[in-house]
Amino acid sequence: SIEFLHGMKLVWETIMKHLVDHYKGLAILRSVSVSHFDGNPWDKGGTCKKTQPYFDPDGKMELPWTPNEIFKIQNNELRKAIVLKGNASKPILKLLDVTYSSLLRPDGHPGVYRIQSSTEPKNDCVHWCMPGPIDMWNQLMFSDPDVMCMNMSKDSNS
């Protein structure tokens, strides 16, 4: 809904302003990941029983409307923050873009693998726990030289 997106924009504006004004390190912000409910939303009996990744060699699979709009907000607010910080070397602001790659991994949700009590939700198609998606996010993050340099300097100070 429009109210949700407006709230998301305000949150990202506030976070970016705070980082630019008060933070002097490396900030890695993760883009929105995609849920994979089939049939209905989570609270109306939607399920996510996928056990294999999607195959999209041409990159033509479209993002659902809501994650696409959230991603635009995240990207725009990060760009505005980079302009706002100007020539300052700190903070270093990075966006770990997992939005499209998470779309391709409906098999990474715990829903079909969970053992749950009768009081717990029956499907979890939003959170990530299975090997694959999270490992790929880590590889993306640590392939960035700024992240590697920050980690190396932390290790050398201990």
Where are the regions that the model predicts?
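Extracellular glycan-modifying ectodomains
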Residues: 1-158
